[in-house]
């Protein structure tokens, strides 16, 4: 599955243990991660200023994301009204790249639910969908991913 992880999901994964870290590991292990330069720039700032993560850890995490993801940049902004204009560029990048799911904790984006072919899910919704799909796949003799 083509997945775009929003800044808040990546920041939580890098700075804390828990669901977002599990989501990031699963996406790295079994899916195709898409990311934009905007998200990487936001992530650097959030990790440094909000979470007070060391510069070495920030550099390592950004390097990992750059190495193991597909670049996604916006072509045209969708005709959607959002308070945060930066979120429009993130949605546009995901749509332009043909991403299936945008995983975010941003309530305004989550309220949209879907834009074009892009489904917008919370980390919990995404995780539950993955686990449901894995159970179905395991029942048909398909490999079950575990991370």
Predicted regions and their residues:
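Glycine-rich, phosphate-binding/catalytic loops in enzymes
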Residues: 20-23, 52, 119-121
């Amino acid at each position: 599955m083509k997945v775009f992880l929003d800044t808040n999901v990546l920041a939580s994964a890098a700075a804390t243990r828990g669901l977002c870290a599990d989501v990031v590991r699963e996406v790295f292990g079994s899916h195709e991660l898409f990311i934009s330069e905007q998200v990487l720039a936001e992530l650097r700032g959030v990790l440094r200023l909000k979470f007070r993560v060391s510069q070495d850890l920030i550099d390592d995490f950004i390097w990992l994301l750059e190495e193991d993801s597909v670049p996604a940049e916006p072509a045209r902004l969708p005709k959607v009204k959002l308070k945060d204009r930066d979120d429009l560029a993130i949605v546009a990048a995901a749509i332009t790249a043909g991403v299936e799911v945008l995983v975010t904790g941003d309530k305004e984006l989550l309220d949209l639910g879907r834009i074009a072919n892009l489904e917008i899910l919370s980390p919990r919704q995404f995780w539950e969908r993955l686990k449901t799909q894995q159970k179905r796949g395991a029942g048909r003799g398909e490999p079950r991913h575990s991370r």
